[in-house]
Amino acid sequence: MNALAQKTPSPPTLVFTEAAVRKVKGLIDEENNPYLNLRVFITGGGCSGFQYGFTFDEAINSDDLVIEKQLEEEDDDEGGTGQMALVKLLVDPLSLQYLQGAEIDYREDVSGAQFVIRNPNAKTTCGCGSSFAA
């Protein structure tokens, strides 16, 4: 059998949903600094062993995974302005090991608004969803 025929497409490294992109764009606009990027990282701690972190960062390290998403600028009236904005998500290599295949989303509901990470690598998660065990 041909080795190429057995090759399956690899899943996306990380999914950055449109809702998350729009929220990040809004937060960057509030800071009035177009050079900001959203950095997602993993640190030790939390009730399950690891916890997610989010911060804004102007610096892009040479070994960062950079996910770029284009988003049409919204207008106060109807629809968009036709101009495109670029939003970047940054992940360092160590954190990427734990975030491979995860989805970063933004959710608003009756309980509040927050960034949500759906992580297929998490074996267990805490009730609040901000920490996990791998």
UniProtKB/Swiss-Prot annotation:
InterPro entries, A to Z: FeS_biogenesis (IPR000361), FeS_cluster_insertion (IPR016092), FeS_cluster_insertion_CS (IPR017870), FeS_cluster_insertion_RrpA (IPR023063), HesB-like_dom_sf (IPR035903)
One annotated Gene Ontology cellular component of this protein: cytosol
Names of the cofactor(s): iron-sulfur cluster
Binding site for iron-sulfur cluster: C47, C126, C128
A biological-process GO annotation: iron-sulfur cluster assembly
Keyword tags: Iron, Iron-sulfur, Metal-binding
GO molecular function: 2 iron, 2 sulfur cluster binding; 4 iron, 4 sulfur cluster binding; iron ion binding
Keyword 4Fe-4S: no
Transmembrane residue ranges: none
Cofactor binding summary note: Binds 1 iron-sulfur cluster per subunit.
A UniProt-annotated Pfam family: Fe-S_biosyn
Protein role: Required for insertion of 4Fe-4S clusters for at least IspG.
Quaternary structure and interacting proteins, as annotated: Homodimer.
NCBIfam families for the chain: iron-sulfur cluster assembly accessory protein, PRK13623.1
Assigned protein family: Belongs to the HesB/IscA family.
Name by which UniProt lists this protein: Iron-sulfur cluster insertion protein ErpA
Organism: Coxiella burnetii (strain RSA 493 / Nine Mile phase I)
